């Protein structure tokens, strides 16, 4: 028996965001649970060599935003298509990614392939053209949506998606099991980090959107970390969860903070490598608390039971904190150094209690993430 064939044609994986591969690992766990018959999965990727090391159970074809011969072959012979993970419904960066999704959906319709969205997020759409693209060309064709939060379902309803086609699940990253600290500790020992003081893990972005909301972002983070070091003797681990280089990415934000900090002697940056999710999570597990602007760095913290403070630039981080009943969150546009420092200080002081609460909540989120199987089942029934 050759089994059923799924194409995952939206080629976000391998782009440089460690969270993407966490979602792909979660998807692989869902596929593995289906024991009726084998499922073969072909995944579009910007970096097949890296992604195949992270999730070796799938087949990969290179995608750079265009449809090549292998891409066309996979889409022709697959039984169904899935849009897996990330946030395909958004337009704050412009027409992408909805333009990609529209092309995939159009292809599915032309080839009479079933298509669903699995484990996806949404944001408010600001452009009328984006709204029409979703309501008129995408929503009528997509057979089912499993989404991260109730707010995602509300947004889809606002854009005319039939609510019977939507299941509230959770991010696929919740299906990645926690790890121990051994990998992270080996690196921290190599970097000569003292083990007898609190360790604050920091992940920040440096994209245009964030700087428009808070132009003094690097200076604010530097002031907060200086104060936390003076107050508690903490060390600071700066980590890029998005490893691409350039003005808009995490590594630039890290350097901007280090340049502005007075206590850079207590700060160190983890080498900017394309770490596997388990390696990133091991670094997080070594931390006392974390400060994050990225969605999956927050999930990594929650998975590891490490209290985090969220600087939310978009709806998905706010939605995550709401789901977790988590009050250590600030909107980026409203953030000031006093409030950020206060939240970090409270998280550090109450970390044992908060860690236990996160571990308890993790169990519920893992169960919810399992509901993503409904989109898989829908296209294969």
Question: What is each residue range found by the language model?
Answer:
Residues 1-381:
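Active-site anion-handling motifs in enzyme catalytic cores
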């Amino acid at each position: 028996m050759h089994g059923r064939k799924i194409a995952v044609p939206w080629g976000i994986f391998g782009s440089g965001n460690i969270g993407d591969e966490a979602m792909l690992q979660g998807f692989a766990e869902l596929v593995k649970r289906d024991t009726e018959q084998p499922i073969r999965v072909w995944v579009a990727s910007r970096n097949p060599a890296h992604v195949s090391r992270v999730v070796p159970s799938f087949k990969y074809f290179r995608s750079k935003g265009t449809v090549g011969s292998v891409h066309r072959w996979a889409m022709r012979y697959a039984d169904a298509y899935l849009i897996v993970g990330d946030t395909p419904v958004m337009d704050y960066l412009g027409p992408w990614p909805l333009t990609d999704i529209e092309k995939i959906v159009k292809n599915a319709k032309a080839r009479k392939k079933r298509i669903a969205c699995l484990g996806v997020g949404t944001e408010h759409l600001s452009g009328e053209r984006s709204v029409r693209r979703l309501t008129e060309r995408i929503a009528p064709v997509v057979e089912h949506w499993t989404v991260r939060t109730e707010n995602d379902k509300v947004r889809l309803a606002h854009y005319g998606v039939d609510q019977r086609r939507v299941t509230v699940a959770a991010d696929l990253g919740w299906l990645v099991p926690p790890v121990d600290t051994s990998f992270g500790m080996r690196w921290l020992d190599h970097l000569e980090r003292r083990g007898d003081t609190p360790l604050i893990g920091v992940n920040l972005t440096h994209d245009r959107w964030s700087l428009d909301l808070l132009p003094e972002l690097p200076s604010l983070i530097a002031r907060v970390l200086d104060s936390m070091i003076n107050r508690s003797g903490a060390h600071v681990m700066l980590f890029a969860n998005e490893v691409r280089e350039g003005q808009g990415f995490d590594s630039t934000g890290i350097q901007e903070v280090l340049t502005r900090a007075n206590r850079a002697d207590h700060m160190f940056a983890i080498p900017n490598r394309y770490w596997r999710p388990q390696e990133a999570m091991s670094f997080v597990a070594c931390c006392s608390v974390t400060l994050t602007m990225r969605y999956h760095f927050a999930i990594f913290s929650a998975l590891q039971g490490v209290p985090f403070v969220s600087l939310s630039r978009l709806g998905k981080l706010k939605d995550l904190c709401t789901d977790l009943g988590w009050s250590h969150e600030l909107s980026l546009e409203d953030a000031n150094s006093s409030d950020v420092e206060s939240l970090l200080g409270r998280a550090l002081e109450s970390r044992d209690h908060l860690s236990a609460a996160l571990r308890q909540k993790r169990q519920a989120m893992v169960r919810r993430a399992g509901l993503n199987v409904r989109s898989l089942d829908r296209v294969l029934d």
